[in-house]
Amino acid sequence: MASYKNIFKITHNDVLPIQGSILIAEPFLQDAYFQRSVVLLIEHTEHGSMGFVLNKKTDLIVNSFFKEFAEFPEIPIYLGGPVSPNRLFFIHSLGDNIIPDALKINDYLYFDGDFNALKRYILNGHPIDGKVKFFLGYSGWTEGQLNHEIKRNSWAVSHITTDNILSADGEGYWKDSVELLGNDYKTWTKYPKDPYLN
């Protein structure tokens, strides 16, 4: 009889993580924060890594924390990761001309910046749906930790980012990201979350 490991053998690529990469959780990862998650790396150096889970929306909204936004359409908050879970972060495509002091992640994404400038932008009536994404907490790895997890096959790395990163949510986005890895990975989307329950 085929062993469990052979039945659910996972193929991984050899793509190395860099700033702006996305990490796609392998299908059996059981961690509450990272199960079927897609993580955007906003920093990756020899000293450690930082990123945000893109597809885990919470029941919280930004409007509840800032009375100025009480009458605005609801602005969702996502679960960025287990580190600093009470701190609010944001990524955006507005650029550092609109949001000073924003850190450039790649050609079209930025991290944080002057929050007062962002508030003014919203209060002036500019829509932010699909342009700004808020998180509570972030995902962090110490020196060498992420590379170890990748070698252990917890993550597949991709430099392909979709144009809906700022509005992505749910397991459907994980499946879409897996399919962008190529045909070798399509079986990932067919696996049960827990193979022992299949």
UniProtKB/Swiss-Prot annotation:
Pfam families from the UniProt entry: DUF179
Residue ranges of coiled coil: none
Source species, domain of life: Bacteria
Annotated Gene Ontology cellular component terms: cytosol
InterPro entries with a match to the protein in the record: AlgH-like
PANTHER family (UniProt xref): UNCHARACTERIZED PROTEIN YQGE, UPF0301 PROTEIN YQGE
Sequence similarity: Belongs to the UPF0301 (AlgH) family.
Protein's recorded name: UPF0301 protein BDI_1431
Originating species: Parabacteroides distasonis (strain ATCC 8503 / DSM 20701 / CIP 104284 / JCM 5825 / NCTC 11152)
